[in-house]
């Protein structure tokens, strides 16, 4: 008798654990910088910008479909989480910019970087929902290719977020926080661009 083997995937909710651990590491580096600069520990307003960036990084990397991930996890479930986190992240980033509206206006890089990041990620999220979600894709006029290119504005959002934090004097001088932030951001963006050309 032939038996059909069903592949058992690991829990997709591991993603939330990875995001939590990554966020705690980055928050730790940030607070280290604040304490070294003589500032009190803990600032939830900054976290409303940093944690969404951590989410962007993790989900953008997983969207490249690394082999270690695809061999253990269900991609369909991953994209469901991807969409939900995309919506939540846009909302939190909008709240972050609202909290810092007056202060960010004093910095050209901080102001424009923040709003370019929000706009780019917002468009990337909407395009992903409209053109790349299986159920919605059937009723949209534009094709999958258009959706993919618009969704790549996510990379623009990551670069804009990096420019955003360089606009604030205190954070821009933090070591090792800022170098780590820069390396992760541009490392991932370059890797994604490399994969884009590799597939051609």
Task: Explain the meaning of each model-derived region.
Residues 2-200:
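Membrane-embedded alpha-helical bundles that constitute the cytochrome b-like, heme-associated redox core
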């Amino acid at each position: 008798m032939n038996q059909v083997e069903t592949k058992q995937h690991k829990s997709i909710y591991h993603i939330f654990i990875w995001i939590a651990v990554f966020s705690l590491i980055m928050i730790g580096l940030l607070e280290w910088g604040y304490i070294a600069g003589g500032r009190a520990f803990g600032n939830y307003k900054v976290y409303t910008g940093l944690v969404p960036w951590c989410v962007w990084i993790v989900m953008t990397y997983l969207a490249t479909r690394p082999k270690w991930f695809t061999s253990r996890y269900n991609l369909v479930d991953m994209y469901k989480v991807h969409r939900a986190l995309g919506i939540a992240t846009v909302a939190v980033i909008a709240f972050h910019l609202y909290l810092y509206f007056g202060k960010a206006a004093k910095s050209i890089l901080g102001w424009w970087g923040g709003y370019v990041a929000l706009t780019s990620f917002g468009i990337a999220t909407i395009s992903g929902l409209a053109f790349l979600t299986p159920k919605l894709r059937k009723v949209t006029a534009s094709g999958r290719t258009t959706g993919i290119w618009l969704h790549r504005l996510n990379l623009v959002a990551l670069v804009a977020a990096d420019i955003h934090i360089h606009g604030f004097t205190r954070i821009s001088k933090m070591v090792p926080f800022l170098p780590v932030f820069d390396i992760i951001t541009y490392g991932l963006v370059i890797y994604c661009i490399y994969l884009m050309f590799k597939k051609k």
